[in-house]
């Protein structure tokens, strides 16, 4: 079989905020690589928010922050950052309209713990724990944040449309469907022109990978761009309706051997 480059989303696909990554998924990725293929993480998380349970997976490389950062073999090859001025403006606009800013960078994530709490997202303290010394408060760093993207947490009474009307000059907007446990009340703000597909396109150009050998696994609407781009698309069993519509195959969820079974279906392991 031709060598394939397989790109895996993180949350909801190959890891869970509470449970980490199932052993079956780790073993499947190892088998994929042993068979001569490439395995890439392709996540909306910024590089700072790639914790131990993702680091333990032997990925060929990582595309993080929706295409804003690319690394291979532990070496950072590309890192698109918003200017500190736009980062500061983003915080001010989101707060003005009642949204909570979480600012995501390759080296640090920035948010204020008295503002971004478990009452806003049940997993907020888990993020803080996973980040360790890669967490920074916004307070005191307003003028020097180094970020790739932002996440806006919606709260009761917020005016998200007013905030996005201002910030859409600088960001592309990703809206999530429904009230899933991880992304239901989050709006992602990604640098203009960047998404997971852009990251994948850059990787295959850099490393001479034919487009027809690209495979993606994903579940949420921040995977839409890569599902519209890649040659072969596998949706997880818990995927959003839009992702399932675009998929060539729908596997089960990660805790019911979805990664393993999806790779077996494609005859890659």
Regions found by a protein language model. Name each.
Residues 1-3, 36, 59, 98, ...:
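A general structural motif
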Residues 18-124:
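Active-site phosphate-binding/coordination module
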Residues 1-5, 22, 186-269:
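Mg2+-dependent phosphoryl-transfer enzymes with acidic/Ser/Thr/Gly-rich catalytic loops
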Residues 57-58, 66, 169-171, 229-230, ...:
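Short, structured coil segments at secondary-structure junctions
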Residues 10-11:
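Residue immediately C-terminal to the conserved phosphorylatable aspartate in receiver
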Residues 99, 104-217, 221:
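Conserved acidic, metal-coordinating active-site core of Asp-based
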Residues 59-66, 174-176, 233-237, 251-252:
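Short hydrophobic/aromatic-enriched beta-strand-loop microsegments
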């Amino acid at each position: 079989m031709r060598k394939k480059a397989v790109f895996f989303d993180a949350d909801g696909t190959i890891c869970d905020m509470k449970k980490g990554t199932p052993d079956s998924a780790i073993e499947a990725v190892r088998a994929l690589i042993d068979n001569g293929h490439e395995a890439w993480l392709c996540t909306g998380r910024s590089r700072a928010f790639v914790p131990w349970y993702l680091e333990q997976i032997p990925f060929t490389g990582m595309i993080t922050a929706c295409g804003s950062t690319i690394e291979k073999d532990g070496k950072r090859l590309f890192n698109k950052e918003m200017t500190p001025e736009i980062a500061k403006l983003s915080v001010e606009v989101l707060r003005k309209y009642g949204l909570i800013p979480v600012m995501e960078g390759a080296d640090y994530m920035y948010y204020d713990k008295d503002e971004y709490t478990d009452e806003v997202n049940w997993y907020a303290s888990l993020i803080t724990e996973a980040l360790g010394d890669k967490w920074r408060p916004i307070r005191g760093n307003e003028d020097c944040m180094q970020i790739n993207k932002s996440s806006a947490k919606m709260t009761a009474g917020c005016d998200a449309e007013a905030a996005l009307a201002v910030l859409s000059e600088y960001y592309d907007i990703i809206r999530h469907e429904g009230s899933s446990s991880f992304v239901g009340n989050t709006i992602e703000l990604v640098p203009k022109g960047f998404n997971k597909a852009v990251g994948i396109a850059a990787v295959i150009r850099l490393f001479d990978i034919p487009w027809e050998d690209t495979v993606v696994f994903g579940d949420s609407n921040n995977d839409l761009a890569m599902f519209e781009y890649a040659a072969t698309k596998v949706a997880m069993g818990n995927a959003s309706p839009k992702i399932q519509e675009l998929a060539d195959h729908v596997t089960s969820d990660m805790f019911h051997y979805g990664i393993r079974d999806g790779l077996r279906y494609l005859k890659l392991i």
